[in-house]
């Protein structure tokens, strides 16, 4: 009844569904545990001893302690809590399963402790390793590369609550041929991404969109404004690109992860005191609070963007286990709101979406993901043509430029 191509796709459907659901459940479990732990550390515990959670003493002390604990996990756990996210790309080959408990624990403590990184890199590493370890036993004919693709697609769908991001990302890597069309290759990853996003939606839905005024009609001047905003965001991001490898090398001369992360946590605490609680944690909930605030002005948005960018660099350079996409979205939103406050003639929909596009492009160097993040934070179909046009000069600016990553050091 089915063509052999269709039968091949159907055979991959079951593993794809299982991987997608499992990827989402791992993410949900980690986020729920981190959320409970965060409420205890930042609400119940300080209230029980009569200290304000936003006091300088508590912020500096909590982040310093978080750094020390994560450092102890990295030093003494099997596999040293997985690869350093500052060195490894978001999607890479499977790591040893023995490193996963330490990696998961380091992630949860970092998220709960207020570190300015998201969950995407460790969750991706965990899901890829689990998929390869269990999948190779259950379905030995499927290669490790296929398990990596399915797990990463399922994780992307779970992280962003939609399979669209995975479809966009893998459409540029799983190109078709005369024998196998691109959509044949995309079928199983898209199935995994759909399963991951639907499973996530049963428990919670990521809140990316901001309450920003509707963009009515594209004008020529808006394209120029958007390109300038994206260029400003790229310039800010390139400062981080320059700083990260140098700071990473400087800190890792100490050799001891407990000392490195303790110092990193202390600096993050100082930055948290300067920027306030909005600059702590992964940034999604804080971005909503920032957008809904009626008291913040241009200077406040500028401070939030600069402090969060510095915190992102410090956290990544120190070796905290976390991702850089979610903080980059926060930085882009803060930068966009600041630019709109300075030049109100440029709609906030343009400044925010184009700033996010520029920052995420610097962090990921992935045009589709950058467009996707800009479009989901400012969900306005009238903006899509403008964002696609603005992407062109932004991509030209970054062509051949170094990535936001540290260099490997000899032990």
From Swiss-Prot:
Location(s), subcellular: Cell membrane
Main location: membrane
Membrane topology note: Multi-pass membrane protein
Cellular component annotations (GO), alphabetically ordered: plasma membrane
Transmembrane regions: 9-29, 54-74, 99-119, 149-169, 186-206, 223-243, 258-278, 296-316, 322-342, 343-363, 386-406
HAMAP family: CLC_YfeO
Record's protein name: Putative ion-transport protein YfeO
Gene: yfeO
């Amino acid at each position: 009844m089915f063509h052999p191509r269709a039968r091949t796709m159907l055979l991959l459907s079951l593993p794809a569904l299982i991987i997608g659901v499992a990827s989402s459940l791992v993410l949900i479990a980690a986020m729920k545990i981190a959320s409970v732990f965060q409420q205890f550390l930042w609400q119940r515990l300080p209230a029980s001893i009569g200290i304000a959670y936003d006091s300088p003493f508590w912020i500096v002390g909590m982040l310093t302690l978080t750094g020390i604990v994560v450092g102890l996990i990295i030093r003494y756990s099997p596999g040293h809590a997985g690869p350093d996210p500052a060195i490894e790309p978001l999607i890479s080959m499977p790591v040893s399963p023995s490193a996963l408990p330490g990696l998961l624990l380091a992630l949860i403590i970092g998220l709960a402790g207020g570190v300015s990184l998201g969950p995407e890199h460790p969750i991706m590493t965990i899901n890829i390793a689990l998929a390869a370890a269990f999948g190779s036993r259950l379905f030995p004919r499927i290669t490790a590369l296929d398990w990596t693709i399915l797990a990463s697609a399922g994780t992307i769908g779970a992280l962003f609550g939609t399979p669209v991001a995975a479809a966009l990302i893998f459409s540029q890597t799983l190109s078709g041929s005369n024998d196998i069309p691109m959509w044949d290759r995309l079928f199983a990853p898209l199935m995994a991404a759909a399963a991951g996003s639907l499973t996530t939606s049963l428990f919670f839905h990521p809140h990316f969109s901001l309450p920003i005024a509707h963009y009515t009609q594209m004008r020529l001047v808006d394209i120029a404004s958007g390109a300038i905003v994206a260029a400003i965001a790229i310039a800010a991001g390139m400062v981080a690109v320059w700083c990260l490898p140098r700071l990473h090398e400087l800190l890792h001369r100490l050799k001891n992860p407990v000392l490195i992360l303790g110092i990193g946590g202390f600096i993050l605490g100082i930055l948290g005191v300067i920027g306030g609680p909005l600059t702590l944690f992964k940034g999604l909930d804080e971005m909503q609070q920032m957008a809904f605030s009626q008291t913040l002005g241009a200077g406040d948005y500028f401070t939030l963007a600069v402090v969060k960018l510095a915190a992102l660099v410090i956290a990544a350079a120190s070796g905290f286990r976390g991702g850089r996409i979610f903080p980059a979205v926060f930085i882009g939103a803060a930068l966009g709101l600041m630019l709109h406050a300075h030049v109100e003639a440029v709609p906030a929909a343009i400044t925010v979406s184009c700033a996010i596009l520029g920052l995420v492009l610097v962090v990921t160097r992935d045009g589709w993901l950058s467009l996707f993040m800009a479009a989901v934070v400012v969900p306005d179909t009238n903006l899509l043509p403008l964002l696609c046009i603005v992407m062109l000069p932004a991509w030209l600016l970054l062509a051949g430029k170094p990535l936001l990553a540290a260099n490997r050091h000899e032990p």
